[in-house]
Amino acid sequence: MNKTVELLGDKAEYLLSHTCKTIDKSTLHLPSPHTVEEVWVASDRNIPTLNSLQRLLGHGRLGGTGYVSILPVDQGIEHTAGASFAPNPIYFDPENIVRLAIEGGCNGVASTLGVLGAVARRYAHKIPFVVKINHNELLTYPNSYDQVLFGSVEQAWEMGAVAVGATIYFGSAESRRQLTEIAAAFEHAHDLGMATILWCYLRNNAFKKDGVDYHSAADLTGQADHLGATIGADIVKQKLPTCNGGFRAIGFGKTDDKMYTELASDHPIDLCRYQVANSYMGRVGLINSGGESHGASDLADAVATAVINKRAGGMGLISGRKAFQRPMNEGIELLHAIQDVYLDPSITIA
């Protein structure tokens, strides 16, 4: 705890002593060593899928806790390889991406069909693979908010992956096509015995209004999580909420006053708790993203995000750029610091 308190600085008391008075923790399905048998056994997931979930939950420094720490490196497509790997060019080589995940103690590594396929025979049995099957590439001009399939569920299965990952840009012009596409892909993945992880991101220029970016609003992101759970995601990945009231500010959708008065407050843990609630009260695990690298503050920022996620009832963190856009030893240190939050029994559910 002492290292976490030191890293949190003047935020320590605010984040570590908060008691959630919105959605009570007793109503949540919280991560535990028995998550698969206590939550997923009751679902329609087949036995091979349960085995894949258990393998993911059982690996790395967080193995057996119910929490996950995943290294995601799909930015070579999403943000261009040059921009992503210029800070540390060793990560142009897929093997170093997988090495960082292994030495960083991660539960799994999430990357592209090409990256993981390049080293699958050497590493698929050493760390769980999550193959990302769709992407938004940055060579089509002008850029459009569309995720297109780069690989198939069968290709992920044949390389020994335990899970497939996909992104839906909720709110974008192509979101309904993406919904039906990924719903079908997730159904097929479950048939083959793989787990499913959905990047539930919002994309619409209208979600920015009066200088406020509502792409990370709790009400909008919570609904995106709910849609992700609806199409069969076992785990949803979401940005940490930074505000609320997106529906009302933009002037669309349906709301209830209690969404903003009783189910959430302006505290980041309560906002994240609202995301957990929308993920079937934690039956579908919520992992928050680490966000872009800002340099010297990355370690403290990552630890703060982990504390918020854990105390809200989330399942873990998926942190990429903060880990790989620096020397490998520093990336390993950052991943371990994130994991230490989930391993610390004194950091409790709010």
Feature-to-residue mapping (PLM):
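Glycine-rich beta-strand-to-loop/alpha-helix junction loops that act as flexible
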Residues: 286-292, 319-322
